Amino acid sequence: MKEKKRKLLQINITANWGSHGKIAESIGKIVQQNGWESYIAYGRWMNPSQSELYRIGSDWDERIHGLGSRLLDNHGLMSKKATQRLIEYMTHVQPDVIHLHNIHGYYLNYPMLFKYLEQAAIPTVWTLHDCWAFTGHCAHYMYIHCEKWKTHCEKCPNLQTYPKSWFKDRSYQNFEDKQKAFLSVKNLTLVPVSNWLEQQVKQSFLRHVNTLTIHNGIDTSLFCPASHLSAIRQKYNIPDTNEVILGVASNWYHKGLTDFVQLRNLLNNNYSIVLVGLSTRELKSLPQGIIGIPRTQNVAELVSLYSTALVYVNPTWEDNYPTTNLEAIACGTPVITYDTGGSPEAVDNHTGFVVPQGNIEQVATLIQQIQHSGKDTFSAACRARAEKLFRKEDCFSEYYKLYEKLISR
């Protein structure tokens, strides 16, 4: 008799789109290689996938949910029909493991989902890509140094950040609702993506839930030192004699754009600052001496930029475990990062430097130090670290090991 295949069902805001969607896609491929079936349920935005895809809700439902969230601060409490249909789909699939990623984003009703998870008693893994799971409102609180989430959220000072609320502050009740829902599932394992985030979880109402940190990985066969770099300099009019200081973000909010403007004033014109991922408004506001590039899906161009750079600078004010650090190091480029969240965890003494938040003068000094030493003194160590620690095949295989462990209990 043919053995029944194991089934993994993942839930995320996107499918094979953006960093978290691609993580879910990579995990799906790994379980398929081990004989499993893979399903991904998503809210919006997708690329073709090797997994079976299921769209949760619709564009219209998402807009209504988004409006309700802005008016009533009830993010995650709408989309009831969409969530009921998702539950029916999950009941049809009968997965052996359910893996949650970002369940926020105006597409899902989390009390309904967790009621189902509680009743179904299916082993559930939840990768925490941010802090939304244990706050009464926000996904990030580092920038304003808020610690209300450690005791009980109320009178939220962060209402104007995602998921933005224009009028109402429901943070006290949201905190209560999340606590009730998320602590109801006994067969739940939390997976923070950085040691820093694990320590935050341990100080929250989720402190007693099983937790295992698994760092994100990247495709080190794609992100590797590139050659023939003159073309990228020509494309963006970077002088051959200039050293390139690179910054990359998909969204520059709280990622240090103003810090780069300050850095430009501290460095002479022998350095070219290149920033990737800027919006149209940000591109228009750039001062002279900074080269701005819109968000790109062109990985080959990104690899060329990483490889061209003398150093990758990440003056982020809010982050958990930025993938861009890994990508730069894999391309043989040292990293200078602020001591923010889990960002320093990608770097060691041979591959970069960690600087206190806001100390842009020290960043400038370290750039000059790296130039004096020569990038070559870092490149081999960078590549070796990437091959040892950042390979996505190794990182995401840890999830498969976790699934097998949970099923065998």
Where are these regions (language model features)?
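Short alpha-helical donor nucleotide-sugar binding micro-motif in glycosyltransferases
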Residues: 304-309
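Nucleotide-activated donor-binding/catalytic signature segment of Leloir-type glycosyltransferases, i.e.
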Residues: 280-303
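Aromatic "clamp/platform" in nucleotide-sugar-dependent glycosyltransferases that forms part
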Residues: 317
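Short hydrophobic beta-strand element within catalytic cores of glycosyltransferases
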Residues: 334-337
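A short, well-ordered alpha-helix in the C-terminal region of glycosyltransferases
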Residues: 376-389, 395-401
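Conserved acidic donor-binding segment of nucleotide-sugar-dependent glycosyltransferases
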Residues: 349, 353-360, 369-374
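Short acidic/histidine- and often glycine-rich active-site loop of Leloir-type glycosyltransferases
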Residues: 284, 339-354
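Conserved donor-binding/catalytic core segment of Leloir-type glycosyltransferases
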Residues: 191, 239-255, 261-264
